[in-house]
Curated annotation (Swiss-Prot):
Enzyme class at the top of the EC tree: lyase
Cellular location(s): Cytoplasm
CDD domains given in the database record: Argininosuccinate_lyase
Name of the molecule in the record: Argininosuccinate lyase
Superkingdom field: Archaea
Organism annotation: Methanosarcina acetivorans (strain ATCC 35395 / DSM 2834 / JCM 12185 / C2A)
Length: 491
């Protein structure tokens, strides 16, 4: 059978190399189900608008359901994309006089834009669920470790004591913003371009609101030229994915470092480790290392999308075909990474005794000692900073005598003469006292962390409800679509 797309305008068929070069069929596997759904909704609307007969509608719907049942492998991969291949298969089944009417009032331009949005919408919903699961795991783990001391770091140097709960919740907070960004992107993805046709809409009396409703979209992309030519939603999602992967990469880096012999803060479960082909004692954190590497997939996809979309005149250009594979690669990598990270965190073995012992290494209580000088001796913080810095340089344990000696050099008087006592110094140098004192909002004090964790658990419950509401809305729309398809098919 001749190519239903080329036979009118073009005489020569493309050779095999051009077919391979121009074809998107392999990538279009991502949108097979979406394309069937779009065809079903469009056909229903055509019938309701009186553009096709009830009998033709019935045959087209039956054919589409059969194609869905057969799967994509039954399609002809010699076509340049899934849309023409699917339509060709339909025409083979029901004849051109019937199947050839399905594309009335429609272009591949609005069709593919709708398919991409439908598929990406599902991927974003799945990603929201996966980020939610990771955040929930982090919060649950933090709840068990509000009093587990550990060193906090700046520049990867021991800085101040904190708790494991405080550290875990820092990652959860970043992931919470990632969750919000995915939600925001979802709101702009969940818009329907169908009915825009090539770019100038159509003279057929289409009901765009009806197909929007049947496909469960929140609203329309109203301007028909914008509807088919915009891929800013892909760029936005790729940016969100890149940000998320960078946050995951930071977590992965910490897991690599923390599981090393030098740190020994944690041990990864064997599931997430590998060994050496020559060194039998090795337990390598390969999964976490791969996650660092796979961050490049997401960042690279963003760069590709920006480069492809730059400088394209309105409206549709074939360059956009090269944009779509990047988003599928990115979202596939990101979703897998979130799932894997959740598993690594949930199953890792924590060494609280090592964390606690390391919490005071490197004079981590120095800041609290300086703060104590300010509070108890009434000196300026910058002066206290100088005194403690000199003590740190000498490397000796701060005692009241040593502190007074340095203070005499800096101030010309002792701090004990200004009310500082040995008891105050001991309390300042105690990491537990350090943590308990830091009870302002967002601090690591156990009491404050318990309040924070409670607030995060409430937020997670709300997030779970939000996801369920969106899914229910989309599921209801597709149930309604299938019900009307079943009704019209029986005519």
């Amino acid at each position: 059978m001749s190519n239903i797309l080329r036979r009118g305008r073009l005489e020569a068929a493309p050779d095999e190399e051009i077919l391979r070069y121009a074809s998107s069929m392999e990538t279009d596997r991502w949108i097979f189900s979406a394309d069937i759904a779009v065809d079903l909704a469009h056909t229903v609307m055509l019938k309701e608008q009186g553009i096709i007969s009830a009998e033709d509608c019935s045959k087209i719907l039956a054919g589409l359901l059969k194609i869905r049942e057969e799967g994509m492998e039954k399609l002809d991969f010699s076509y340049e994309d899934i849309h023409i291949s699917l339509e060709s298969r339909l025409i083979d089944m029901v004849g051109e006089d019937v199947g050839g009417r399905m594309h009335s009032g429609r272009s591949r331009n609005d069709e593919v834009a709708t398919c991409i949005r439908l598929t990406l919408r599902e991927e974003l919903l799945g990603l929201l669920e996966e980020i939610f699961a990771l955040r929930k795991t982090l919060v649950s783990l933090a709840e068990k470790h509000t009093e587990t001391l550990m060193p906090g770091f700046t520049h990867l140097q021991h800085a101040q004591p904190t708790t494991l709960a405080h550290h875990l919740c820092a990652h959860e907070a970043a992931l919470g913003r990632d969750f919000d960004r995915v939600q925001d992107a979802f709101s702009r993805v969940n818009l329907c371009p169908l009915g825009a046709a090539a770019f100038a809409s159509t003279g057929f009396n289409l009901n765009r609101k009806r197909t929007q409703e049947l496909l469960g979209f929140e609203g329309l992309l109203e301007n028909s030229m914008d509807a088919v030519s915009s891929r800013d939603f892909l760029i936005e999602c790729a940016s969100v994915f890149s940000n998320l992967m960078i946050n995951l990469s930071r977590m992965a880096e910490e897991l690599v470092i923390w599981s090393s012999s030098e740190f020994n803060f944690i041990e990864l479960d064997d599931t997430y480790a590998s060994t050496s082909s020559i060194m039998p004692q090795k337990k390598n954190p390969d999964t976490a290392e791969l996650m660092r590497g796979k961050t490049g997939v997401a960042v690279g996809a963003l760069m590709s999308l920006l480069t492809i979309c730059k400088g394209l005149p309105l409206s549709y250009n074939r360059d956009l075909q090269e944009a779509t594979p990047n988003i599928w690669r990115s979202v596939e990598t990101v979703r897998a990474s979130v799932r894997v990270m959740e598993g690594m965190v949930r199953t890792m073995k924590i060494h609280p005794e090592v964390l606690s012992a390391q919490s005071v290494t490197g004079f981590t209580t120095a800041t609290e000692l300086a703060d104590t000088f300010v509070r108890e001796a009434g000196i300026p913080f910058r002066t206290a900073h100088q005194i403690v810095g000199m003590l740190a340089r000498e490397g000796e344990k701060p005692t009241i005598e040593k502190i007074d000696s340095v203070a005499e050099i800096v101030l010309g008087e002792s701090l004990s003469s200004r009310g500082l006592t040995e008891k105050m110094i001991k309390e300042a140098l105690n990491p537990v006292s350090n943590i308990k004192r830091r009870k302002i909002e967002g601090g690591p004090a156990p009491e404050e962390m318990q309040h924070y964790i409670g607030r995060q658990q409430t937020e997670l419950e709300l997030n779970e409800q939000e996801i369920a509401t969106i899914k229910d809305s989309i599921d209801s729309a597709f149930e309604a679509l299938l019900e009307v398809v079943d009704e019209y098919r029986k005519v």
